[in-house]
Amino acid sequence: MNPSSDSRYVDVAYTNGYEFTQGLGYSLPQYPFIAPEELLDKRVGKHPVVIVGGGITGLTLACGLAKLGVPAVLLDEDNTVGVKGASSRGICYTQKSLEIFQRYGIFDRIARKGVEWSVGRTFAGHDEVFSFDLKAQSSFNLSQQPAFINIQQFYIEGYLVERIAELGRDRPGVELRWSSRVTAFEQQGPSALLTIQTPQGSYQIEAQHVIDATGSHTPFHAWLGAELEGKRGDDRWCIADVKFKTTPPTERHTWIEAPFNENRAVWQHLMGDEVWRIDYQMAPNSDPAQVSREDVVRERLQRQFGHDVQCDIVWVGPYAYRSQCVRQMRIGRVFFMGDTAKVVSPFGARGGNTGIADADNLAWKLAAVVRGRAPESLLHTYHDERLEAAQRNVQVTNRTARFLRPTEPAAQLFRQAAL
């Protein structure tokens, strides 16, 4: 495939505009557009729950509701999971997320495809400065799930789509509407009105509860006047998803200062299908088109693994990131979830895993309220419980980002002393 003509740095909170750069690419499923009754009958449909966004957060919530037998509609502007032809995106899933997926019925699929790991090593130059083995910690055996599984995000999203269909066979289900873009929204007292554009025209639906899981570039922030706190960083990275033909790496390694990358940071993770995800920190003024060229990436790989390394590049592309957090997890009928609520740097696997926890927190509460088994006030606890988690994740990842690229003298001195 040819390189994308748009090679700008993009936010790590990936959106449907995240462009394929170059490489063999990933093969993703495609789901057909099925015209809903509202479009065919030219009427306004009414639904208790509408989820906007079919990424890992929205699909996790949809699966949780389907398991509880709560009817809902999920709208996504694409016709596939992941991002068409794009990268592995989130890859590291924690024990807590895996426990949730066990309850939802997809853990076994994840375990078969993904890679379990518990050992990590961190280097500064050629010196190992830190290591851990989570299996050695006393809390490890308290769960049936492993400490971590690495797997490309689109696989989990695909398993969630499968599971939602399975759960809908014998109980009220969640309707997945692909190629359906929300173009307008307004609050109307006890409900909200959404306008949806499709390949066959537009229609409207009413919802008692709207969940915005569209990601960091959501239009709902502007529609609702949501207040956000955050900043954009100038750290630049390049992802390379690589399949080695000879002498692959053996462990998860992190370099705070990698001698083969101009003493900048490097992450090295094994994912499903024997594909390695390698993240290279770039200079702040790097040209994204230059750093993601195949010949440049191969030269970088040779510096790391030796000139005789043989590998296929599955995907490569540049990214930047910012951090931000909403002040309210709920405004009126709308709940913010996942990257819509907070955007964090990728360090510590706190993006997708937090969205999964958001979804699990809200699913049972929505089910209880929709069924009339709990008062509406129960939904207020979503903000109380999940905002603190979002703020904490932004704080922790910002601290990590400052350590990886200190810009102030005090931060530089602290890093030198720590290493």
Where do the language-model regions lie?
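Extreme N-terminal leader/targeting segments of oxidoreductases
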Residues: M1-V49, G64-L68
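Glycine-rich FAD pyrophosphate-binding loop
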Residues: A66-R89
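A conserved short coil-to-beta-strand element within the FAD-binding core of flavoproteins
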Residues: W178-A192, G317-Y319
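A conserved beta-strand/loop element that lines the FAD pocket in flavoprotein oxidoreductases
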Residues: L167-V182
